[in-house]
Amino acid sequence: MDSAAVELKDVRAFSVREKLLAYVELTKPRIAFLLVLTSAAGFYLATKDSFNTILFINSMIGISLLAFGVATLNQWVERDIDPLMERTEKRPLPSKRVTPTEALVFGLVQCAVAEAYLFFLVNGLTAVLGLVVIVGYVLVYTPLKTRTSASTAIGAIP
């Protein structure tokens, strides 16, 4: 008799609320808030003449979207090592509340929307700096975290 191998997948269904909370968790909102707070301080300190409220609000929205996207992509890159650490094993990807494809698409869309938002509603320089942050954090800092302690200094640049 032949025996067939059967692959079992985790088929637990999550409620809409659980799924939405998992997506919010992917964005690391507390860290994003701190990034926006420091960006707001920098914006204020860089203001020479009158404070441009509309530009300020648009900048903070764009930076928020960028921070959310980068945090999501960071977790996507670390999806294979997060289940191995107690501190990270309950994140949305290791706990299978979000699939890797969902996280990747979510992160890329957030970053693309952030870049377009910054380019059209803030300025080109801010959008370019946002792109530098995406590349530096997701493609340089995140992979280096497991290879060298120098990654801490690199991660502090953006």
Predicted feature locations:
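Interhelical loop and helix-boundary elements at the membrane-water interface
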Residues: K19-I31, P92-A103, V140-P158
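Membrane-interface elements of multi-pass transporters and channels
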Residues: T47-K48, D80, L84, T88, ...
